From Swiss-Prot:
Pfam families: FadR_C (PF07840), GntR (PF00392). It comes from Klebsiella pneumoniae subsp. pneumoniae (strain ATCC 700721 / MGH 78578). Residues 6-74 form the HTH gntR-type domain. This is Fatty acid metabolism regulator protein. One of its GO terms (cellular component) is cytoplasm. One of its GO terms (molecular function) is fatty-acyl-CoA binding. It comes from the Bacteria. Multifunctional regulator of fatty acid metabolism. Residues 34-53 bind DNA.
Amino acid sequence: MVIKAQSPAGFAEEYIIESIWNNRFPPGSILPAERELSELIGVTRTTLREVLQRLARDGWLTIQHGKPTKVNNFWETSGLNILETLARLDHDSVPQLIDNLLSVRTNISTIFIRTAFRQHPDKALAVLDSAREVEDHADAFAELDYNIFRGLAFASGNPIYGLILNGMKGLYTRIGRHYFSSPEARSLALGFYHQLAKVCEAGLHDQVYELVRRYGHDSGEIWHRMQKSLPGDLAMNMR
């Protein structure tokens, strides 16, 4: 186990998470007693206690007063906030994780974009208008793309969609910085935003589904070609 952390708390958190991932502390098992675990990791009990509370909030553990701390099946108990952690833990599965993330984005955005156009077209157009002045480089497009999808999610009037996008932000924007290094990807995105604006202005809400699905397919093809050059630190630096 190789852990790179800057603080005792960070070290303890990564030690426990990687131990859960590697089944040293398998789901359903009980963590060692606080004194034993603090000595094993090499941190104070106060630091360990803070770390355990944080991991419990993220769904890795269940803390029950007066009872041992239980290791959860994190797939069933955690939220989107652990996406970056999963990418860092299992480098080989990063492409599949990213495919799943982008599939979810496409599926839910067909719903919230159509709703935004139908119920709050002025807000939706204001979000899309931000694409007019974007600088032509990867970082700017990664930020723009995330902000457009997030902005349209909130423009739908259902803030839950926005919260879902919030949970995706870390991994989403990191992927975006690699994806939008391609001029073809940037051009495709600008065309997509422009088409969305035209559909919104014309009130053609029923065209959103096909437009978003087609963009998901076309951008997916570019992404799959780029996966061969996926930077090795895409997951490694996620912490």
